Amino acid sequence: MALDHPDTVRILAFLDEIGIPVSRGRIEGESFLPGIEVRSGGLVLDPARPFHPGDLLHEAGHIAVTDPADRPTLCEVRDDPGEEMAAIAWSYAAARAAGIDTRTLFHADGYLGGGEALAAAFDRGAGPGPP
């Protein structure tokens, strides 16, 4: 997606408003989510790479659910199912607050092919269930 896409603009404004920094910069090598990396408690968005706007909210969710004392040094998302669930729940709440469609957040290319199932579960008010 482009930086000027309406969803991207809305998400970037929301993250700025709540104090999660997003900078534009080059990402060397592969990142877990295309074009986005957690670095020093903020997000780096590589405008030269394709990315999904909803992934910005998901990665911001990892920052948001991290202990505030640990955020400034956060550079890697832990492989923790509980943290992943918390980041998913936070990103859904953030999408609602920012006026972002559930299917922009839980897109078809993400969540190991389970984006539609997550979107449907949250739209029903159920959420994904326990880890």
Describe every region a protein language model picked out.
Residues P47-P50, A98-P131:
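Long, well-structured alpha-helical subdomains associated
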Residues M1-R39, R49-P50, A97:
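Auxiliary, metal-adjacent structural segments of Zn-dependent hydrolase domains
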Residues F32, V65-A93, H107-Y111:
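Post-HEXXH active-site segment of zinc metalloproteases
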Residues L45, R49-P53, E83:
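Secondary-structure capping and boundary motifs in well-ordered enzyme cores
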Residues G35-G42, A64, R124-P131:
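C-terminal capping/extension segments of zinc metalloprotease domains
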Residues G54-D67:
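Active-site recognition of the HExxH zinc-binding catalytic motif
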